[in-house]
Amino acid sequence: PPPKERLHGRNSDWKHLYNADIISMPDKWEYPWYASWDLAFHCISLAIVDPAFAKRQLILFLREWYMHPNGQIPAYEWALGDVNPPVHAWAALRIYRIEAKRKGVADRAFLERVFHKLLLNFTWWVNRKDDEGNNVFEGGFLGLDNIGVFDRSKELPEGGHLEQSDGTSWMAMFSLNMLAIALELAREDKVYEDVASKFFEHFVYIADAMNNLGAECTELWNERDGFYYDVLHMQGHQIPIRLRSMVGLIPLFAVETLEYDWIKDLPDFLRRTEWFLQNRPDLTDDIACLQQPGSNGRRLLALVSEERLRRVLRVMLSESEFLSDYGIRALSRYYKANPYIVEAGGETYRVDYEPGESRSGMFGGNSNWRGPIWFPANYLMIESLQKFDYFFGENFRVEFPTGSGKMLTLWEVSLELEKRLCNIFLKDENGRRAVFGNTEKFQTDEHWRDHLLFFEYFHGDHGRGLGANHQTGWTGLIGKVLQQLGEYENTQPNRKFGVTINTTTDELLRAAGIEK
């Protein structure tokens, strides 16, 4: 038997766990252990080439010998009970749709199977992470490592708690993912209309809390700055953490566009949502909540209103803030010359813009969300912009980049961001790849220069690959990005992009093992 000191240590409450399966690893050398939120992104790329394996991977983590009896999905092997963003439902729905498009037949049994287990996971989140029952989610490590002012996996100053913009946004996104799955299942089984209504109401309550907690005087939306922030509560007072980071962009991930011709055939769901909108307008004033028809009569559910969407995008698409030649940075470049400093609990905390490797030892030091470009966040942002565009259509345009005077639709913006991600890997006019930086052997040696490495994350200014470098799983999302660009170029051969690349996508498609 193990020594007594191990009976109550790390992972001690996961005694049910029995893992002896083939699992997609984040990295076969530097991270040869599973991580559940990484896996969800792996499965999107895997679904292009092997949807059956991708589905089995998602199902596996919901089985009784993985999922905790209380509904928590194991986070990663070092600390199974840590908390990562709830993206399993999103991945399941995306894989379901990818396979349906590819094969012409949807695997309803798969979607139904994961949905029932994800109900347990959703309930765990609501019971464990909504500390005060006010639909604001706080506490714990949420996968963005050192992005915040504080180490969010440890005790905060003066025993305070952090009401997290990203934690609450992830739950709003989770609610909409579950709503979308329930509506898909309700097309053939009306029983799912009831649970769809449940997730609609969950979303509305979370969105209301996110935008204005009213009596608690907590607003995660900052009207002056036009951005979302965390709020630190300490001994009767609160401090807004006015740090412009990916934390304030994640609210855009909570979006779903619905076909009205589809939901009008679900009378119970439609009746309940219409009652809610008529009788609780106080909860829906600051969000997009089915009220107005959009392009082709579609309806929008989103955490951000149209006006707030424009304001957040104005910051995100500024090259002096988040927009890099290689994607969206995790932290605004503004802090390069203007470090963010806040005092709390008698201590001074500081965050600098660090586009390369972290100068902090937080989370081992070999990880950095204070400036670099990360594929999972960029991919979710691209997809969210496309969902918004599906509702708003041609008439909704924003400056890209901010201040340029060039107005693009959100679909066009999403494609420009995809091109910038591709620019990490593709050769520039001098035949050099940003991903290899100043490593001359990789840039020029004929035996190495065309062997692309999908690094963990990338330099926020130069695109150089950083962190783990041996085919890190979630950077494989570039394959899905390239597939979409390839399909679009085939249907729009004369389309001109604002970001010029000096080769077609064929090169990287081949490297990713994908044929156009």
Language-model-detected regions and their locations in the chain:
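Acidic, mature catalytic/reactive cores of soluble proteins
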Residues: P1-K516
